[in-house]
Protein backbone atom coordinates (compact mmCIF):
# COMPACT_ATOMS: atom_id res chain seq x y z
CA UNK A 1 0.00 0.00 0.00
CA UNK A 2 1.41 3.36 -1.02
CA UNK A 3 1.68 6.15 1.56
CA UNK A 4 0.05 9.53 1.05
CA UNK A 5 2.13 12.69 0.72
CA UNK A 6 3.29 14.74 3.69
CA UNK A 7 1.02 17.56 2.53
CA UNK A 8 -2.02 15.28 2.48
CA UNK A 9 -1.22 13.91 5.93
CA UNK A 10 -0.84 17.44 7.29
CA UNK A 11 -4.19 18.47 5.79
CA UNK A 12 -5.88 15.33 7.13
CA UNK A 13 -4.45 15.94 10.58
CA UNK A 14 -5.71 19.52 10.50
CA UNK A 15 -9.16 18.36 9.36
CA UNK A 16 -9.34 15.89 12.24
CA UNK A 17 -8.35 18.63 14.71
CA UNK A 18 -11.05 20.95 13.33
CA UNK A 19 -13.76 18.29 13.47
CA UNK A 20 -15.62 19.59 16.46
CA UNK A 21 -19.12 19.27 17.80
CA UNK A 22 -20.92 22.43 16.60
CA UNK A 23 -23.65 24.07 18.66
CA UNK A 24 -23.97 27.36 16.79
CA UNK A 25 -25.12 26.92 13.23
CA UNK A 26 -25.76 29.21 10.31
CA UNK A 27 -29.45 29.19 9.51
CA UNK A 28 -29.17 29.26 5.71
CA UNK A 29 -30.13 26.03 3.95
CA UNK A 30 -27.48 23.42 3.25
CA UNK A 31 -26.96 22.84 -0.46
CA UNK A 32 -28.86 19.66 -1.32
CA UNK A 33 -26.10 18.24 -3.54
CA UNK A 34 -23.54 18.80 -0.79
CA UNK A 35 -25.80 17.18 1.81
CA UNK A 36 -26.20 14.15 -0.47
CA UNK A 37 -22.40 13.95 -0.84
CA UNK A 38 -22.10 13.94 2.94
CA UNK A 39 -24.70 11.20 3.28
CA UNK A 40 -23.02 9.21 0.49
CA UNK A 41 -19.92 8.85 2.67
CA UNK A 42 -21.82 6.10 4.51
CA UNK A 43 -21.25 3.96 1.41
CA UNK A 44 -17.51 4.27 1.95
CA UNK A 45 -17.59 3.32 5.61
CA UNK A 46 -16.42 -0.06 6.81
CA UNK A 47 -19.02 -2.16 8.58
CA UNK A 48 -18.86 -5.48 10.34
CA UNK A 49 -19.62 -8.24 7.84
CA UNK A 50 -20.62 -5.56 5.31
CA UNK A 51 -23.84 -5.29 7.31
CA UNK A 52 -24.23 -1.52 6.78
CA UNK A 53 -26.45 -1.33 9.87
CA UNK A 54 -26.99 2.43 9.74
CA UNK A 55 -30.45 3.81 9.20
CA UNK A 56 -30.62 7.49 8.30
CA UNK A 57 -33.70 9.66 8.65
CA UNK A 58 -33.87 13.28 7.53
CA UNK A 59 -36.22 15.07 9.88
CA UNK A 60 -37.71 17.67 7.56
CA UNK A 61 -41.19 18.51 8.77
CA UNK A 62 -41.44 21.41 11.24
CA UNK A 63 -43.66 19.28 13.49
CA UNK A 64 -41.14 16.43 13.74
CA UNK A 65 -38.25 18.84 14.18
CA UNK A 66 -40.16 20.45 17.06
CA UNK A 67 -40.86 17.05 18.63
CA UNK A 68 -37.15 16.25 18.43
CA UNK A 69 -36.26 19.57 20.06
CA UNK A 70 -38.83 19.03 22.81
CA UNK A 71 -37.47 15.52 23.35
CA UNK A 72 -34.01 17.00 23.87
CA UNK A 73 -35.35 19.72 26.19
CA UNK A 74 -37.15 17.17 28.38
CA UNK A 75 -34.14 14.84 28.54
CA UNK A 76 -31.83 17.77 29.25
CA UNK A 77 -34.05 18.95 32.14
CA UNK A 78 -33.99 15.42 33.55
CA UNK A 79 -30.20 15.31 33.24
CA UNK A 80 -29.91 18.69 34.98
CA UNK A 81 -31.96 17.33 37.90
CA UNK A 82 -29.14 14.86 38.50
CA UNK A 83 -26.74 17.66 39.45
CA UNK A 84 -26.55 19.92 42.50
CA UNK A 85 -24.84 23.17 43.35
CA UNK A 86 -21.86 24.17 41.22
CA UNK A 87 -22.22 21.18 38.92
CA UNK A 88 -25.87 22.09 38.25
CA UNK A 89 -24.89 25.70 37.55
CA UNK A 90 -22.11 24.59 35.22
CA UNK A 91 -24.37 22.09 33.42
CA UNK A 92 -27.18 24.61 32.95
CA UNK A 93 -24.70 27.06 31.43
CA UNK A 94 -23.55 24.65 28.72
CA UNK A 95 -24.95 24.96 25.22
CA UNK A 96 -25.55 21.28 24.58
CA UNK A 97 -27.67 21.53 21.45
CA UNK A 98 -28.04 23.75 18.41
CA UNK A 99 -31.13 21.93 17.20
CA UNK A 100 -33.31 25.06 17.04
CA UNK A 101 -30.85 26.84 14.76
CA UNK A 102 -29.61 23.93 12.66
CA UNK A 103 -30.92 23.97 9.10
CA UNK A 104 -30.93 20.15 8.96
CA UNK A 105 -31.84 17.43 11.42
CA UNK A 106 -30.56 13.96 10.60
CA UNK A 107 -31.31 11.05 12.90
CA UNK A 108 -28.99 8.08 12.58
CA UNK A 109 -29.86 4.73 14.09
CA UNK A 110 -28.23 1.32 14.31
CA UNK A 111 -30.31 -1.61 13.09
CA UNK A 112 -29.14 -4.32 15.47
CA UNK A 113 -31.48 -6.81 13.81
CA UNK A 114 -30.24 -6.42 10.25
CA UNK A 115 -29.76 -9.68 8.37
CA UNK A 116 -27.45 -8.03 5.84
CA UNK A 117 -24.00 -9.53 6.22
CA UNK A 118 -25.35 -12.80 7.64
CA UNK A 119 -24.08 -11.88 11.14
CA UNK A 120 -20.48 -12.17 9.92
CA UNK A 121 -18.32 -10.73 12.70
CA UNK A 122 -21.36 -9.80 14.78
CA UNK A 123 -22.25 -13.19 16.21
CA UNK A 124 -19.59 -13.02 18.88
CA UNK A 125 -19.46 -9.22 19.07
CA UNK A 126 -22.86 -7.75 18.18
CA UNK A 127 -21.73 -4.34 19.42
CA UNK A 128 -19.60 -4.14 16.26
CA UNK A 129 -22.72 -3.01 14.39
CA UNK A 130 -22.91 0.07 16.60
CA UNK A 131 -19.19 0.69 16.18
CA UNK A 132 -19.75 0.49 12.42
CA UNK A 133 -22.40 3.21 12.64
CA UNK A 134 -20.13 5.43 14.73
CA UNK A 135 -17.33 5.00 12.19
CA UNK A 136 -19.66 5.94 9.35
CA UNK A 137 -20.84 9.03 11.20
CA UNK A 138 -17.22 10.06 11.69
CA UNK A 139 -16.57 9.80 7.94
CA UNK A 140 -19.62 11.96 7.25
CA UNK A 141 -18.46 14.45 9.88
CA UNK A 142 -15.01 14.79 8.32
CA UNK A 143 -16.50 15.18 4.85
CA UNK A 144 -18.95 17.84 6.06
CA UNK A 145 -16.21 19.72 7.87
CA UNK A 146 -13.98 19.64 4.78
CA UNK A 147 -16.75 21.61 3.03
CA UNK A 148 -17.17 24.09 5.88
CA UNK A 149 -20.28 22.43 7.31
CA UNK A 150 -20.60 21.85 11.03
CA UNK A 151 -22.31 18.92 12.69
CA UNK A 152 -23.46 18.37 16.22
CA UNK A 153 -23.96 15.11 18.04
CA UNK A 154 -27.04 15.12 20.27
CA UNK A 155 -27.16 12.23 22.70
CA UNK A 156 -29.33 13.80 25.39
CA UNK A 157 -32.55 12.29 24.08
CA UNK A 158 -35.17 9.73 24.97
CA UNK A 159 -34.29 7.38 22.10
CA UNK A 160 -37.41 5.15 22.32
CA UNK A 161 -39.65 8.23 22.26
CA UNK A 162 -37.71 9.67 19.33
CA UNK A 163 -38.23 6.39 17.45
CA UNK A 164 -41.96 6.60 18.18
CA UNK A 165 -42.14 10.25 17.13
CA UNK A 166 -40.26 9.54 13.89
CA UNK A 167 -42.26 6.35 13.27
CA UNK A 168 -39.12 4.19 13.22
Predicted region positions:
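A structural motif
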Residues: 35-43
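Specificity-determining recognition surfaces
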Residues: 1-36, 52
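Glycine/small-residue-rich phosphate/adenosyl-binding loop
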Residues: 52-133
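A generic local secondary-structure boundary/capping motif
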Residues: 94-97, 164-168
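Short glycine-enriched loop/turn motifs at secondary-structure junctions
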Residues: 19-21, 49-53, 101, 145-147
Amino acid sequence: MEAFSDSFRTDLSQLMRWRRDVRRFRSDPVDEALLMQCLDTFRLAPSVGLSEPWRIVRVKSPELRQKSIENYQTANATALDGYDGEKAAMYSGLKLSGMSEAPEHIAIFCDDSTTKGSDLGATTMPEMRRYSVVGAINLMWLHARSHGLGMGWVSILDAPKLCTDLDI
